């Protein structure tokens, strides 16, 4: 509590409801770390306003990307995050694809001569797997043994397919606007959250749900 108070006393600006320089990283970090207290909604509003003021584009880099992406995701702003990422301009992943990148590049603009095989901007991976595909640990658990599967289709996405390997085997998710198929490895179990909020408890094996 004392450290949070000291942090807010030093960096929070009540007149603008922002932190530090007011940049996207400056506001996303304390939001993600739970330092904003009663000012959470105001700081979140300031963050969203800054994103929109930049044409729905990010201004973060290697340090701030993860906190921006996860702050938006954890506050239900996945459609905004999708709009920030689903384009072919710089800064953005589409610009790298447009210029022939087959691996992540060190700079948003791959033509700047830096490394062409660099995980510098790879923090989006967490959002793809944990939010879009919805592959998560059940709260209070670790190691992807007790799973929470909660896919989120945003924007104009028609489907999402993903798989990842845990200590227990391959976990796979295939979700469309009308169905969800999951494959849970032996030794694991999962809570499945359907789009209407209905929860299903399943063990290992392949399970399909229509909605």
Model-predicted regions and their roles:
Residues 1-5:
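Conserved small/polar residues in nucleotide/adenosyl-binding loops
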Residues 6-14, 92-95:
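Secretory-pathway/luminal and periplasmic proteins that interact with or process carbohydrate-rich
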Residues 9-27, 47-65, 111-120:
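Solvent-exposed loop and edge beta-strand segments that line ligand/cofactor-binding
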Residues 29-38, 67-75, 130-135:
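Well-ordered alpha-helical scaffold segments within catalytic/enzyme domains
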Residues 40-48:
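Alpha-helical repeat scaffolds
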Residues 53-92, 99:
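Repeat-solenoid scaffold signature
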Residues 82-211:
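Non-catalytic C-terminal accessory modules of carbohydrate-active enzymes
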């Amino acid at each position: 509590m004392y450290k949070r108070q000291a942090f807010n006393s030093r960096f929070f600006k009540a007149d603008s409801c922002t932190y530090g320089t007011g940049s996207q990283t400056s506001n996303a970090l304390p939001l993600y770390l739970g330092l904003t207290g009663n000012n959470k909604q105001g700081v979140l509003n300031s963050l969203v306003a800054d994103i929109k003021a930049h044409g729905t584009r990010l201004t973060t880099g290697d340090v701030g990307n993860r906190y921006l992406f996860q702050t938006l995701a954890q506050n239900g702003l996945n459609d905004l995050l999708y709009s920030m990422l689903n384009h072919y301009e710089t800064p953005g992943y589409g610009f790298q694809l447009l210029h022939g990148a087959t691996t992540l590049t060190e700079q948003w603009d791959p033509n700047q001569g830096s490394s062409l095989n660099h995980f510098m901007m790879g923090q989006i991976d967490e959002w793809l797997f944990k939010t879009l595909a919805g592959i998560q640990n059940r709260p209070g658990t670790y190691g992807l043994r007790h799973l929470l599967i909660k896919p989120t289709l945003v924007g104009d996405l028609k489907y999402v397919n993903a798989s990842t390997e845990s200590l227990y085997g391959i976990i796979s998710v295939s979700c469309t606007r009308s169905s969800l198929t999951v494959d849970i490895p032996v030794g694991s179990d999962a809570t499945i959250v359907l789009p209407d909020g209905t929860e299903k408890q399943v063990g290992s094996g392949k399970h399909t749900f229509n909605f």
